[in-house]
């Protein structure tokens, strides 16, 4: 009998084929700004840009939607990058002095980035590396000369030449420091070495000439054609960088003392002793080094000199600046993060006599800024991608699918009004290389991110490029201490240097209480709820015109004067009084302040009923924002929940208190074994456990899915935290009358269901009558294992989730089945369970017991469309665990469909930030500035599909080492595993390019159907199941 019960059932081939058409797993694209960038390159012919990172990632960007991603096999920092112009090839230098050649190749109509060749110099050339010269140790600088030669400058001062086609050393072409010193006067040598090679620059007109700069200050023009030194410049100041003038008649050098010098190359063959111009822009006091300098000529005669660094060391040495000098105009661009590199977009054709720069692109540690150099004032150019998601730290996120076109246009219009008009740029985005082959998205998707500074940002998440649309700020509603400090700081600011704040990255929050914790948006009424750290809940409405009005303020006491609790956390925010001006966009109408002012942990918005529900660690409330009056307040604190009153900044238990509670638990466990109450439920649990122990033979091989779910103590810390809130029109009173309900789930496994009396709207009217809403407690369910309730959803008579407010009434979704019996799906951290309504009796359950310690973290209902049939789709439950695994279950049967490894289990922040979409996709943070996008749907995939117009040279075809797929992320999981065993190939989708390693889901998951005929003895199996729910019916 036992062998029969634990035997796995065979897979249905038809169902497995259908799974292939519905589900597949892809990590598709990384949205946002690369984490910890370290190198920058630009191809002026193809108009593409590359960014390298400290984790070894390579990212190439062109026009919006044109993206390529690669990852070096060794997690080393990319220190330099150089494009082979017009070839779609990129040379990277890592901090281990290895060189790597990447190529963009065409395959199946789309372009891909692959690593072709690599060059690894020996770490100790004198030992067993006779083929390598002794001076080839640490590479300090790389130059691509004459299109087919790689020039390497080293720490020893030697210069080596490699063939681009093979990355092999060219024999007999090494330039040693001794050979250079022979061209230098004796009095300059002074017995000192030249130092490392600091800079290598190729001549724009004559590719055979190379400008070499050594650390000590010596500059040399080397001719590859004659293999000789053509000119020597005897600099004495430590060198930082070099740049040729357009025609090659001048050289500009920058130095460690904050100065730059201009040298003339037309002085003949003798060594040049002095530069023609030496300037310290921010002198005369000691200045920091000018790290990089560019000289760009203009047809008008006023040339550009652009450099980073050089600030006065004592007063502004901590500033991150790039200075732009043209004629008598000097602007000091002041950034909030470190400058990595910069380049100009200018004319590079040899026949053009001038550079005529169009734009300046500055790569910073936390953002990319592009300035228009052709418009007076040099304004910033709005970026269509690479926006810094973390301009203020992300605290929450949400996704809104199928946004109506009218609402989309209104949000875009509000965002366009936010950009400063006087400094608007006439220049379009200058990085326009490649062609986006992806089709226009069939629906618009919004990604909403809440931030630490009290802002909510709206992003266009419809395609590959995550485009900023609109920013909502809530800080203006409240009085903060920073307002006076800001005005003083602006008054003290000097006129010199001429600083200009550039960029939007601002890591500092004015007040930590402003942080956004939860966001909800009704896409049909353009109403929104934003909840924050200090218990503030804002109800906002989209307005197309600016306005001035007073925001209604209401307080809701969640403790309800309960004695014995004293709040020790932060104070609530003080709102401004009186009418306030509001720009076009989302404008606040009502402010609800929870008491105590703890962080809001859950919100729900029902615009059709004009209700908003909110929860904290103390309880939950219901507010009627049409009448601007509270409807309900319920405290969920347990008498021992003192930790909830201490606030987020004082949650450290004393050792004395911890020891006392430990001894109490030991004493309680001993006593409970002797004096356990002999109730009917406890007798049933004891009988189940005894029967399981007696009937289970020890030699039976059990599936590794079964684990006893231990009931948690009712007095666990923070058991009153409200985890989820939900509105539904369903059957709660009886099986014949349905009506509005509100559901709340807590950390202690409690579920509260309220029947609401909401006045019905008149025929054709949008708003309901001005009558009070009433709430009556209908059911109270206590999960016996007391696991936190993560999500609640009501299913209609067909087993489908109820539509969103206004979806059915506006014929935007199929009306729910209100004839058959409804059911409620309750997802806790340990199991999923479906209960019938209105009796709340268990129908189906699924215990998530794949591994010890496995817990549910995120849950969402999603629609998965078939790739073979336009009309077939299934609604399933997507689940992310604390181990980083994603599971998909059927609804309402709760049968496992697929199981993938998505996020590393050590990546706690990534798991906590995950957001599922309604169409089987998801987002999670792989760094503070990047979202990883993934897809569980075989049909709904958003990934880069692009191409480059490249004329390949004949010898460009080289053996490939490896393709760098989009799945090999610098910050994510490298391996994609776990899916049904019978699905041996990837689905027959045009987007499916990879076959995943499969594994039978039964090895990790086990469904139980309580209503089935064979379920009688399943409840008495070896799990020792104690999950008998306790249900109170207050309406019976």
UniProtKB/Swiss-Prot annotation:
InterPro entries hit by this protein: Lethal2_giant (IPR000664), Lgl_C_dom (IPR013905), LLGL2 (IPR013577), WD40/YVTN_repeat-like_dom_sf (IPR015943), WD40_repeat_dom_sf (IPR036322), WD40_rpt (IPR001680)
Superkingdom field: Eukaryota
Keyword vocabulary terms for this entry: Cell projection, Cytoplasm, Cytoskeleton, Endosome, Exocytosis, Golgi apparatus, Membrane, Phosphoprotein, Repeat, WD repeat
Modification Phosphothreonine occurs at: 957
Keyword Cytoplasm applies: yes
GO biological process, one term: regulation of establishment or maintenance of cell polarity
Positions of post-translational Phosphoserine modification: 662, 964, 982, 989
GO cellular component, one term: cytoplasm
Transmembrane regions listed in the UniProt entry: none
Description of post-translational modifications: Phosphorylated by PRKCI.
Compartment list: Early endosome membrane; Golgi apparatus, trans-Golgi network membrane; Golgi apparatus membrane; Cell projection, Axon
Secretion signal span: none
Gene3D superfamilies, sorted: YVTN repeat-like/Quinoprotein amine dehydrogenase
GO molecular function list: GTPase activator activity; myosin II binding; protein kinase binding; small GTPase binding
Functional description taken from the UniProt entry: Cortical cytoskeleton protein found in a complex involved in maintaining cell polarity and epithelial integrity. Involved in the regulation of mitotic spindle orientation, proliferation, differentiation and tissue organization of neuroepithelial cells. Involved in axonogenesis through RAB10 activation thereby regulating vesicular membrane trafficking toward the axonal plasma membrane.
Anything else known: Complements a salt-sensitive yeast mutant (SOP-deleted mutant) and thus can regulate cation homeostasis.
The protein, known as: Lethal(2) giant larvae protein homolog 1
Gene name of this polypeptide: Llgl1
